[in-house]
Amino acid sequence: SLMQGDSARALDPIFRATANEILFAHRSFQWDTEASDGAAVYCVIVGFSFAPGPGARRLFDYDKAKGDPREQAARRINCYLIDTELPGPAKRSTPLLAGLPAMSKGSQPTDKGNLLVKLEQYDEVAADPIAATYLAPWAQSAAILDNEKKWCLWLVDSTAQDREESPILAKRLAAVAETRKESPTPSVKAAARTPWLFTQLRQPTSRWLAIPRHSSEHRICVPMMELGPETIAGDALAYIENCPAWVFVYLQSAAFTDWIRTFSGALESRFRISPDRSSPVTWCSDR
C-alpha cells in the first residue's frame, strides 16, 4: 500500500525534495508462501537511490498475480510506479470540476452485528411487533455484487418506550452497548450511551447510486445500482445522492476504471474506492 493512494501521494514530494529516484520496481504481485494456511499477500519491490546517474530505469509488470514478471524500460518511475516524470494527483477537498455531485460513504454501525438482521434471523425479528416497525433493507457491497439480502434495525426515530418494551430491541441494544464499551476508540466508547444509533450516520434522503468500495480488478467496470432512501447505505458502500445520468455513464466507463486502477488503493489486488473527492477528476483516491 506504500505505492498506492495517499501513501504514494505523500511519498512523491519527499523523494523529489531529497533527490531520491526509483531505479527499478516490481508492480503488485502475489507473494508465494509454503505455509498451508498462508494468507494472500500482495506486494511490490522498489529499489531507489540518492542522486542516481542517467540511464534507463527498469519496471516489471505482472499479467497474472502469480505469473512471471514482464520487464519494460522506463525513463523515470514515480511513486505510483508509473513511467512518467509527473507526480501523482494532488489531494483535494473538493472536485476540480465545479458542479460534480458529492460522493459519501455509507453509515457505520460498529455493533458486532447486533443492529443487523440476516435472512435467517428475519422471521424472528419480524415477529416482534415493535422491532418489526424499525426493520429496513441494509445494503453493503455484497448486496450489489452478490444480491445479498440483509436488513438493519434503523432506530433513528425510535422512542425510549419502544426500545425498552421490545425484547428483541432490548437484548440487541444491550449487546451493542457492551461491544462499544470495550472499544479502544474514544468516540466508539462514548457511543455506548446511544446503542440504538449507528456510530457514523450518513443516510441519503432521496434516491442514490450505490457504489461498492471494494470490487474485483478483473471487472471492466465497477457494478453499481440505484436505490431508494428506504434502503440504508452501509459503510462498505460509497453513494451519490440524486446522481445525474451523465455521471453514472462516466462511472461505468473505461476511463473511470483505469483511473481507480492507477490511483486508488487496493484490498489485496481488488479496487478500493474512497469518497474523499481527492482526485483531480472525481472522488476516488484515498484508501
Task: Outline where the language-model segments fall.
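Short coil/turn segments at secondary-structure boundaries
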Residues: 59-61, 133, 149-154, 183-194, ...
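Short, conserved charged micro-motifs
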Residues: 162-165, 245-250, 287
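Short, flexible loop/turn elements at secondary-structure junctions
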Residues: 1-2, 29, 50-52, 143, ...
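Short Ser/Thr-interspersed hydrophobic loop/turn segments at strand-loop and sheet-helix junctions
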Residues: 138, 179, 203-221, 243-265
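Structural beta-strand/beta-sheet cores of well-ordered domains, especially the beta-sheet scaffolds
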Residues: 41-44, 58, 135-137, 149-151, ...
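Flexible, glycine/threonine-enriched loop-and-boundary segments that flank and lead into catalytic domains
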Residues: 28-31, 168, 172-237
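Signature of N6-adenine DNA methyltransferases within the class I
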Residues: 1-129, 146-147, 160-164, 222, ...
